[in-house]
């Protein structure tokens, strides 16, 4: 279970993202380098004695899709991001595949 202070900060960051959309920048958002998707970003916040990152991307419908989160404090930064990006890429691809399937069904 994610501690309440982390949930609160995640919700606050998600609300900022909803208000500002793709224009939200540092220190709240940064690009995730190494992703298979050029539009992969990370929400950045500190909470519960942790340094949290949430991988997300704006999909073709311009919705922000939050994909995976993790506390990078105390971890090898390289290993942390490799794992975060791999999971985010996989989940985002599944999301895009579902959108494509829905679009095909509507035709």
Which stretches of residues belong to each language-model region?
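Basic, Lys/Arg-enriched alpha-helical interface segments
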Residues: 1-51, 60-64, 71-107
